[in-house]
């Protein structure tokens, strides 16, 4: 999940150097088997792979950038399409944990997760459910990171604040039936 058009990213607006797709080994700190890895540019809502191609699909903090809950659900359906029966899909994204009236397009509310993300594909069954237990209130009153300083990882939950929106991450595992 590398993006090339956000103003918040490094490398003159790109999250990664422009030649990383052509020469990934140049940026990898360890050797890897080049014949077993392929780097591609693709649209997460229209994956360029055959049905049932993969045993495992993983989306790490990507679907929140696709244009809302409906587009995120479409990306999960695409992951389901390319995952083999019995395969696993892992999705990590941002969860807006307060009921703030502030809108933040790159995080999901509980309702969006329940209405769009979890039920995106009827062939994908949530593994071990979803816990909605939130961190203690003092974590919300004193968030770890206001996007101006480093993340503090000694606390159990990492709660972030962007303006008045409090959010954290969630991770879901699905098994394809």
Please give the residue ranges for each predicted region.
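Class I SAM-dependent methyltransferase SAM/SAH-binding core
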Residues: 1-46
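Short, solvent-exposed loop/turn segments at secondary-structure junctions
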Residues: 2-4, 45, 63-64, 95-98, ...
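A short acidic, Gly/Pro-enriched loop at the edge of an enzyme's catalytic core
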Residues: 42-57
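A short SAM/SAH-binding and catalytic strip from SAM-dependent methyltransferases
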Residues: 55-70
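A short glycine-rich, Lys/Arg-flanked "PGG" loop and its adjoining helix->strand segment in the class I
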Residues: 72-85
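Conserved beta-strand signature within the Rossmann-like core of class I S-adenosyl-L-methionine
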Residues: 86-94
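Conserved Class I S-adenosyl-L-methionine
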Residues: 100-134
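A C-terminal cap/extension of S-adenosyl-L-methionine-dependent methyltransferases
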Residues: 130-177
């Amino acid at each position: 999940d590398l993006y090339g058009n956000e103003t918040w990213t490094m490398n003159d607006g790109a999250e990664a150097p422009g030649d990383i797709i052509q020469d990934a080994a140049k940026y990898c700190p360890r050797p890897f088997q080049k014949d077993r890895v392929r780097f591609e540019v693709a649209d997460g809502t229209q994956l360029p792979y055959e049905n049932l191609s993969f045993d495992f699909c993983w989306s790490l903090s990507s679907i929140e950038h696709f244009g809302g809950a409906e587009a995120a659900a479409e990306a999960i359906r695409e992951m389901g399409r390319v995952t083999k029966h019995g395969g696993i899909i892992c999705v990590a994204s941002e969860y807006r944990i307060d009921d703030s009236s502030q809108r933040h397009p790159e995080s999901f509310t509980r309702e969006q997760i329940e209405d769009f993300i979890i039920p995106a594909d009827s062939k994908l069954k949530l593994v071990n459910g979803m816990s909605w237990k939130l961190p203690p209130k003092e974590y919300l009153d004193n968030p770890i990171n206001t996007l101006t300083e480093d993340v503090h990882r000694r606390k159990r939950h990492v709660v972030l604040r962007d303006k008045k929106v409090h959010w954290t991450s969630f991770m879901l595992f699905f098994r394809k039936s």
